[in-house]
């Protein structure tokens, strides 16, 4: 078992985090933590896509990380490669007031740790993101693209106040110019978006000498069934090869622990149950009532 999953009940909000080891905590530790309780963006493959409670405070964000290290008796100073990713529940850039001070504190507490902001690209002031990334040189930036056309992406990510694919390219290049670090785009590889034409569109949008690609095997929303099946892994691997041929550096996001208690964002049973038990706190998001995309068969 290389993954541990945690739920935090803040009384007025619920959050979740995941802790990974590859293969030991001393060699590589990865933490995925929440920045919001629920999510207003409503991605149709995400278990948190139906409801939004509130943004988390900086203390609540930092507290998740501190608890995970303490719970497994991990000494961050002895970890060869440590990564803290803001990519569990919530859209980080819709909580810059909580995220920015949390990043500064985490950088002071764990100066060796890489800090990754994973965003669906809402329309916010990206100059603030660039400035924060220059100030804290451990910050990385990843845009959740997931499709090669805006039409298909809009069906997957119904939140309207977001950047287009072309606008993401512009902001990513500006971030690269400001920081000297390569941004990532993440892409959910499924049966309908892994053609050569998809790879060509991505290459035309995102310059391979600037961008790196993260290909995800998890494109389903499901509380009880393993999502990262072998077919998904094969699709991801084949599409990574297509992108490699076009000059991209690629990596695979294959989160361990996609098991019968639900491993993806917002899928842990306690989170789902908490949302159902607190209808006055868990407000309907833009995705509520829309069809689920890529449901497992």
Task: Give names to the regions the model predicted.
Residues 1-12, 173-182, 187-297:
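Auxiliary Fe-S-binding modules of radical SAM enzymes
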Residues 1-35, 67-78, 281:
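N-terminal [4Fe-4S]-dependent radical SAM core
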Residues 10-12, 21, 37, 90, ...:
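Short, flexible active-site-adjacent loop segments at beta-strand->alpha-helix junctions, enriched
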Residues 21, 142-145, 254-256:
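Residues at the C-termini of beta-strands that transition into short coil/loop
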Residues 27-31, 47-191, 212-214:
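Core AdoMet radical
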Residues 33, 55, 162, 229-237:
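Short, conserved loop/turn and helix-capping segments at secondary-structure boundaries
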Residues 37-39, 145-147, 217-219:
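Short, small-residue-rich loop/turn micro-motifs
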Residues 39, 43-46:
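Short cysteine clusters
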């Amino acid at each position: 078992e290389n993954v541990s999953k945690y739920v935090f009940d803040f009384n007025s909000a619920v959050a979740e985090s995941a802790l990974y080891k590859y293969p030991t905590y001393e060699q590589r530790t990865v933490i995925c933590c929440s920045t919001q309780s629920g999510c207003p963006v409503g991605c149709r493959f995400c278990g948190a896509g139906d409801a939004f409670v509130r943004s988390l405070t900086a203390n609540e964000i930092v507290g998740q990380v501190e608890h995970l290290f303490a719970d497994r008796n991990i000494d961050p100073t002895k970890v060869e490669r440590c990564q803290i990713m803001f990519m569990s529940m919530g859209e980080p850039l819709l909580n810059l007031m909580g995220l920015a001070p949390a990043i500064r504190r985490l950088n002071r507490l764990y100066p060796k740790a890489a800090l990754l902001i994973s965003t669906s690209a809402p329309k916010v002031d990206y100059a603030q993101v660039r400035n924060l990334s220059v100030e804290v040189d451990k910050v990385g930036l990843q845009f959740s693209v997931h499709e090669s056309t805006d039409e298909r992406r809009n069906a997957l990510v119904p939140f309207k106040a977001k950047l287009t694919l072309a606008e993401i390219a512009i902001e990513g290049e500006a971030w690269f110019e400001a920081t000297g670090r390569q941004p990532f785009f993440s892409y959910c590889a499924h049966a309908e978006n892994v053609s050569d034409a998809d790879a060509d569109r991505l290459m035309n949008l995102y310059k391979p000498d600037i961008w790196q690609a993260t290909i995800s095997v998890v494109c389903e929303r499901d509380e009880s069934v393993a999502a990262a099946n072998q077919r998904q892994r094969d699709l991801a691997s084949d599409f990574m090869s297509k992108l490699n041929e076009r000059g991209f550096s690629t990596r695979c996001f294959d989160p361990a622990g996609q098991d019968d208690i639900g491993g993806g964002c917002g899928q842990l049973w306690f989170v789902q149950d908490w949302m159902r038990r607190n209808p006055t706190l868990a407000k309907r998001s833009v995705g509520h009532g829309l069809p689920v995309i890529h449901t497992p068969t």
